[in-house]
Amino acid sequence: MKLYQKFPETQVLTTQGVIDFYKDIFGKGKWLFLFAHPADFTPVCTTEFVEFSKAYNDFANLGVQLVGLSVDSVYSHIEWLKDIQEKYGIKVPFPVIADPDKKFARLLDIVDEASGQTIRGVFLVSPDGVIRFIAYYPLEAGRKISELLRITKAMIVNYKAKVVLPANWEPGQDVIVPPPNVFDEATMRMKMPKAKSWYLLFKDYNELPQDQKV
């Protein structure tokens, strides 16, 4: 799958039952944050599940549903989640997709055929079913959850307010109004207080309507 493509219309088996993405997530106005891990009972993936569990409410408060994925069986997932709860005292609150036949993972093009495992991938999908963010991480290094939360907030603001976000943007900081494609509008922009150029116009985040903020 690629950026801006439609997410597959399918159902998947998870540790919390069968999920229909378009009915159970997008149909309820939620975003999907899908993250794949290489395998259950592996060290880096275990630390990621602990940290994603800690951040679960941060995502949920944004209207984002976390969903995990690997090509392990649902029974393997259950045993692993039990082990995490016993070792760390954390109950994993999000569903984890079981995909032992690799059918769903191949739809997303995230199977490492050499190892047979899913790669450490991330897909952020808006409520209209469009993929807004994709990232891949190496086997050897875990994901930084705070950065994934930041990019999630950025894409939600982009989706709602139709603005774009500058480098290192954090909620509360200025946003950017997309550049115009009409000459007269480009000329008028230079008179605006936060204009750096006709193509770079900042806007105060606090001027956005409340329902467009995060």
UniProtKB/Swiss-Prot annotation:
Cellular component GO terms held in the UniProt record: cytosol
Catalytic residue list: C45 (cysteine sulfenic acid (-soh) intermediate)
SUPFAM superfamilies in the record: Thioredoxin-like
GO molecular function: thioredoxin peroxidase activity
Domain of life: Archaea
Enzyme Commission number(s) from the entry: 1.11.1.24
Subcellular location: Cytoplasm
UniProt enzyme class: oxidoreductase
Residue span(s) of domain Thioredoxin: 1-157
Classification via PROSITE patterns: THIOREDOXIN_2
Chain residues that bind substrate: R120
Catalytic activity, as annotated: a hydroperoxide + [thioredoxin]-dithiol = an alcohol + [thioredoxin]-disulfide + H2O
Keywords per UniProt: Antioxidant, Cytoplasm, Oxidoreductase, Peroxidase, Redox-active center
Main location: cytoplasm
GO biological process terms, semicolon-separated: cell redox homeostasis; cellular response to stress; hydrogen peroxide catabolic process; response to oxidative stress
Family listed: Belongs to the peroxiredoxin family. Prx6 subfamily.
NCBIfam families assigned to the protein according to its UniProt record, in alphabetical order: PRK13189.1, PRK13190.1
Role description: Thiol-specific peroxidase that catalyzes the reduction of hydrogen peroxide and organic hydroperoxides to water and alcohols, respectively. Plays a role in cell protection against oxidative stress by detoxifying peroxides.
Note from the entry: The active site is a conserved redox-active cysteine residue, the peroxidatic cysteine (C(P)), which makes the nucleophilic attack on the peroxide substrate. The peroxide oxidizes the C(P)-SH to cysteine sulfenic acid (C(P)-SOH), which then reacts with another cysteine residue, the resolving cysteine (C(R)), to form a disulfide bridge. The disulfide is subsequently reduced by an appropriate electron donor to complete the catalytic cycle. In this 1-Cys peroxiredoxin, no C(R) is present and C(P) instead forms a disulfide with a cysteine from another protein or with a small thiol molecule.
Assembly: Homodecamer. Pentamer of dimers that assemble into a ring structure.
Protein name: Peroxiredoxin 2
Lineage, opening ranks: Archaea, Thermoproteota, Thermoprotei, Sulfolobales, Sulfolobaceae
